[in-house]
Amino acid sequence: MKDKPSEIPYLRIGTSILKRVLLPLSNGQNIETLIPWNVETLRQDFGKDYIAKILKYDGFCTVPSHTDYQREIHGFLNRYEPISTAPVEGEFPHIREVLAHIFGEQVELGYDYLQLLYLRPQQRLPIL
């Protein structure tokens, strides 16, 4: 069995083994989650050599970034997930209309606010 570490669904976080699974939701979609797993079960199912291939992390961290996402940061697994869409140039008349309705005369401030949320998700912003 020649599994690459990225293909192995198991992770070791600190001293715990976790399995990455797709959890089914009632709406028919799935979300990825981590569930605890037993190391002895892994040995029985795959052999002791398999355990050496499991990716190891010291713990979890949460570092949001939409432009420079990193799954691993200094030996820690980032719990923040990348967003599935990326901005593209072009016209957006319907979104512009909704934002104009929400922000009114201050729509330019709304554009700046949304841009900051995307580019600098760690920056503290006022509640609008």
Model-identified regions with their sequence ranges:
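Intein modules and their embedded homing endonuclease domains
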Residues: 1-86, 121
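P-loop NTPase catalytic core of nucleic-acid-dependent motor ATPases
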Residues: 67-128
